[in-house]
Regions:
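Amphipathic alpha-helical dimer-interface segment in Rossmann-like NAD(P)H-dependent oxidoreductases
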Residues: 1-12, 50-51
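Active-site helix of classical SDR
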Residues: 38
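Active-site "substrate specificity/gating" loop of NAD(P)-dependent dehydrogenases
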Residues: 28-32
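Active-site-adjacent segment of SDR/Rossmann-fold oxidoreductases
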Residues: 27, 48-58, 67
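Short-chain dehydrogenase/reductase
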Residues: 1, 46-47, 94-97
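C-terminal helical subdomain
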Residues: 62, 78-126
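Residue(s) in the substrate-gating loop at a strand-loop-helix junction
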Residues: 22
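Short, flexible catalytic-loop segment of classical short-chain dehydrogenase/reductase
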Residues: 64-75
Length: 126
């Protein structure tokens, strides 16, 4: 935020920070306390910084993806899919970041979870 509030290098006139949390930042549930704690901290940073950022014309938003399939989560992803659940893809998360950077209301966080329906991307603002 320090750089952005003094930067004039912004042709569109919009300054935006998107924080990546997790649904674990709201609901816990993974059983990995360090991960859950770090994601709760990101939600706290979002809540604590967006008011100060607005004073400088900076929008601070967040996204909170549900389970996302990556190389690190491949083993769990296989079990997830075997149970008939559809994990997010990195493309789903990337799209949510891009949308949040241009459409998000400061202080908002978007849950990103793929469900078995025609849209494949369900976003709920919390």
């Amino acid at each position: 935020m320090h750089y952005m509030k003094s930067s004039t290098n912004n042709a569109a006139g919009r300054k935006s920070i998107v924080l990546v949390a997790s649904t674990s930042g709201y609901f816990g549930g993974t059983g990995v306390s360090a991960y859950v704690s770090s994601k709760h901290a990101i939600i706290g940073l979002l809540r604590g910084s967006h008011v100060a950022a607005q004073k400088h014309g900076i929008t601070v938003t967040g996204i909170a993806p549900f389970f996302t399939y990556t190389n690190i989560t491949a083993k769990a992803g296989t079990r997830w899919q075997a149970d008939g659940l559809k994990p997010n893809t990195t493309d789903d998360v990337g799209l949510a970041i891009a949308q949040s950077s241009v459409e998000g209301a400061s202080g908002s966080c978007t849950l990103v979870c793929c469900l078995s329906h025609p849209l494949n991307l369900s976003k709920l603002t919390v």
